[in-house]
């Protein structure tokens, strides 16, 4: 079963997790018109990541709500990372997970612009 790492102590769950898999939902904070929230991509990625984490008995990391949304620059509410910042962020997370003996890191991407 996927376990979301949030405000409660998950250290024992990490210790007991034998799958060696961590999943991080990655979305974006950007406009989607007046009919959808700014975090639509994060909501979608989180939904699928939770399902996959349960199926794989993986640890579910908190969602990354920001991505590269350069195509939406100028729309109010959009927060975009530079591609090199996103790459550095992912590398840092990968290094941290590797140090904790996580063998597989899955990014469940919910935003087409995250192509850094």
Which residues are covered by each model-predicted region?
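Active-site and ligand/interface coordination hotspots across diverse enzymes
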Residues: 1-37
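Active-site histidine-anchored catalytic micro-motif
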Residues: 2-7, 63-116
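A generic structural signal for alpha->beta connector loops
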Residues: 20, 55-58
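Glycine-rich, flexible loop/turn motifs
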Residues: 32-34, 60, 77
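Short Gly/Thr/Asp-enriched flexible loops that form oxyanion-binding sites at enzyme active sites
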Residues: 36-37, 41, 112-116
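Short catalytic helix/loop segments, enriched in acidic residues and glycine
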Residues: 39-54
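Glycine/small-residue-rich interface belts in oligomeric ring/scaffold proteins
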Residues: 45-46, 60, 65
């Amino acid at each position: 079963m996927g376990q979301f790492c949030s405000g409660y102590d998950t250290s024992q769950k990490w210790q007991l997790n034998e799958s060696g898999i961590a999943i991080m939902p990655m979305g974006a904070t950007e406009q989607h018109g007046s009919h959808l929230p700014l975090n639509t991509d994060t909501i979608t990625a989180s939904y699928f990541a939770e399902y996959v984490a349960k199926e794989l008995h993986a640890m579910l990391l908190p969602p990354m709500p920001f991505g590269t949304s350069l195509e939406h620059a100028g729309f109010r509410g959009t927060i975009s990372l530079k591609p090199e910042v996103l790459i550095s962020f992912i590398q840092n997370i990968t290094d941290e997970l590797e140090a904790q003996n996580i063998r597989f890191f899955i990014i469940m991407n919910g935003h087409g612009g995250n192509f850094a």
